[in-house]
Design a protein with these regions (language model features):
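C-terminal tail/sorting-segment detector
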Residues: 208-222
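Bacterial Sec-dependent N-terminal signal peptides
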Residues: 1-20
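Cyclophilin-like peptidyl-prolyl cis-trans isomerases
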Residues: 16-174
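Short, ordered coil/turn segments that flank beta-strands lining enzyme active or ligand-binding pockets
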Residues: 27, 194, 212
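Residue-level detector of functionally pivotal "anchor" positions at catalytic/ligand-binding pockets or at interdomain
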Residues: 173-199
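Short loop/turn microsegments at loop-to-beta-strand junctions
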Residues: 20, 186-188, 205
């Protein structure tokens, strides 16, 4: 647990340009979101794992409400739930991507993108009944998101014509020729997962490489 807390503290100081970018390729066009890795590591790690496994390929934006949000990722069977993760600096404003859920700590794979500011969905704002963790923001192609938001739907908010995620891919992976040393001639002490448990290198899984000079690198090996 101490390792996990330390990871959160260390990653809170990482610059924005180190954060993961994800490309959505849909039948309406393409857009990119940038994840808040350092602020909500559990949520982003869960999303990255799903993306890396191809979980969302062929999934639909199955719920669309104009001037509100577009929701996707309803794939069966759903993965295990994750703990809600909130940061006071994040809010459900226009362009942000957030976890969909049916109550506290019930999020799994479904998410939505805010078409407008929906700050009442924040954990720390009235009416305090809806709590949806923000974990990223659309950085390009938001016009495509808006186009999806304008599709015709039935009375259940389901698009008449399927809006398909043809593929969803990590677009900003870091690669290293030598994972066991860094540019400062430091040595690798251990590799841990998002929960701080010591492990060994896995493919398509976010891991944290801890070096003897105190540096921590998040690496996803392909």
């Amino acid at each position: 647990m101490r390792i996990f807390i330390s990871l959160i503290i260390i990653f809170s100081s990482i610059k924005v340009n180190s954060q993961t970018k994800v490309d959505f390729y849909t039948n309406y066009g393409d857009f990119t979101v940038e994840l808040y890795d350092s602020l909500v590591p559990i949520t982003t790690s869960n999303f990255i794992n799903l993306v890396s496994s191809g979980f969302y390929d062929g999934a639909l934006f199955h719920r669309v409400i104009s001037n509100f949000m577009i929701q996707g990722g309803d794939v069966s069977p759903a993965p295990p739930t994750i703990t809600d993760e909130f940061d006071s600096t994040l809010s459900n404003i226009q362009k942000t991507i957030s976890m969909a859920n049916s109550g506290p700590n019930t999020g799994t794979c479904q998410f939505f993108i805010n078409l407008v500011d929906n700050t009442y969905l924040d954990f720390d704002k009235p009416p305090f009944t809806s709590k949806h963790p923000v974990f990223g923001i659309t950085t390009s192609g938001f016009n495509i998101v808006e186009d999806i938001g304008d599709v015709q739907t039935n009375f259940n908010d389901v698009p008449y014509i399927d809006v398909i995620m043809d593929s969803v891919r990590i677009s900003d992976n870091q690669t290293y020729t030598n994972l066991f040393t860094d540019n400062y001639d430091s040595k690798l002490l251990k590799i841990v997962d998002i929960l701080g448990r010591e492990t060994y290198p896995h493919l398509n899984m976010p891991l944290f490489y801890i070096y003897n000079n105190g540096r921590v690198k998040k690496i996803i090996r392909k």
